[in-house]
Amino acid sequence: MGSYTIPNVVERTPQGERSYDVFSRLLSERIIFLGTEIDDGVANVVIAQLLHLESANPEHEIAIYINSPGGSFTSLMAIYDTMTFVQAPISTFCVGQAASTAAVLLAGGDPGRRFVLEHARVLLGQPASGGRQGTVSDLSLQAKEMIRIRSQVEEVLSRHTRHDIATLRADMDRDKVFTAQEAVAYGLADEVLSRRLAVV
């Protein structure tokens, strides 16, 4: 999370005052905030939160707010698979940016529950290679793995955006940046929000 201080929220209850860090307070409202690069540690925390919230109430919506530059493909897929595994409906919100692997999480929300805030951006690009080194046979294996990873990302995005693989491959050949409106038109999200949805 960097070196900045995580704010606390103080609540008054009949038993007295109780202090939470803001992320725990959001979790009590069934909100998960993903605001960092995605690595194994971040993925494990998000997965634990998803499983906890499903266990508490498998029918009540879980909201994931995303402001992330992306990150590890395996970490992304661990979160994505858990999102599809749990019974609870999943809504996704892009605030700031959902770049690279984070864009897949945005698109992976339940149909009709994928939102992007008005001035956010979404970026599609090829999964990072990580600057691999090694013998020729090692590099050959790594190249095959990168092709497999790219194919998996394309298949997931095709499922959620309704674009064919060839279109996605061409669009992801270089980084492609979408405004909020363009992300909706492309099928990465369902609606642009400028204000919170009314509670009914």
Swiss-Prot record:
Primary location: cytoplasm
Top-rank lineage group of the source organism: Bacteria
Subcellular location(s) of the protein: Cytoplasm
InterPro entries, A to Z: ClpP (IPR001907), ClpP/crotonase-like_dom_sf (IPR029045), ClpP/TepA (IPR023562)
Keyword Ligase set for record: no
Biological processes per GO annotation: protein quality control for misfolded or incompletely synthesized proteins
Active-site residue numbers: 100 (nucleophile)
Molecular function as annotated in GO: ATP-dependent peptidase activity; ATPase binding; serine-type endopeptidase activity
Family matches, as Gene3D superfamilies: 2-enoyl-CoA Hydratase, Chain A, domain 1
EC number: 3.4.21.92
Gene Ontology CC: cytoplasm; endopeptidase Clp complex
Catalytic reactions on record: Hydrolysis of proteins to small peptides in the presence of ATP and magnesium. alpha-casein is the usual test substrate. In the absence of ATP, only oligopeptides shorter than five residues are hydrolyzed (such as succinyl-Leu-Tyr-|-NHMec, and Leu-Tyr-Leu-|-Tyr-Trp, in which cleavage of the -Tyr-|-Leu- and -Tyr-|-Trp bonds also occurs)
Keyword Glycoprotein: no
Keywords, ordered alphabetically: Cytoplasm, Hydrolase, Protease, Serine protease
Summary of subunit composition and partner proteins: Fourteen ClpP subunits assemble into 2 heptameric rings which stack back to back to give a disk-like structure with a central cavity, resembling the structure of eukaryotic proteasomes.
Family: Belongs to the peptidase S14 family.
Entry function: Cleaves peptides in various proteins in a process that requires ATP hydrolysis. Has a chymotrypsin-like activity. Plays a major role in the degradation of misfolded proteins.
Name listed for the protein in its UniProt record: ATP-dependent Clp protease proteolytic subunit 2
UniProt source species: Streptomyces avermitilis (strain ATCC 31267 / DSM 46492 / JCM 5070 / NBRC 14893 / NCIMB 12804 / NRRL 8165 / MA-4680)
